[in-house]
């Protein structure tokens, strides 16, 4: 596996606790620096890892020039235009989910990456966390699944939630957009692409999705960031001719999962083989979530 120069775009909590430690420790990465919208945050994170800090338009251009690939830890609507610029400049992409929050922007990013011939990976955690990734790969090799169910009950904004770093885009977009990509990435891994989706809103920020897949299977998802602590948790279950399979208990750390995503990007670069969770997959998730959001708005929900 070749060594790649990778810069980090983003300097918030997610970048601090997941992206930067994984990039700094990876033997196949030369960590080229941290770019942030807030210069002081970029400087603090960069100093912690002994790399240069960048900010502003000129700083982004400098990090781009110094890197073979960029890893993003930004809100989706900030990430998308910067990632499109990076792709057009021939840089490989390690993207956060969702890649964008409107279908046209997601498709434009995917088109730019395809036209430039760059490798890309979207960090949908369950597809890279070793335990869940192995489980999903095993299920995908087996036939006979008729349905699946994914529940992502986050408690970030629950009435009894502990204080957490503010994230305006998550508060605005809610569970559909924040944890929706996780649920869809699990369901699509086993049951295939989606040909029809229906969305219904329950309690505030509780969204239910019903999906019909191209395989003929159906599935459902429940998504929120506002669950009470006692109700918070993640589950995924598939049912078929071989019985019932449920998501393994226990979770790998975010650094371990992101390290696997880095491995996947490096492999895609070396082999010139697209990863299943590339930017086109990310754009497809955005299309599905945008369709669901449109249905909710049309229903006044």
Residue ranges and their predicted role:
Residues 15, 55, 95, 120-122:
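Hydrophobic residues in well-ordered beta-strands that form the structural core
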Residues 51, 89-91, 116-118, 216-217:
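A short helix->loop->beta-strand "cap" motif at the edges of active sites that frequently abuts
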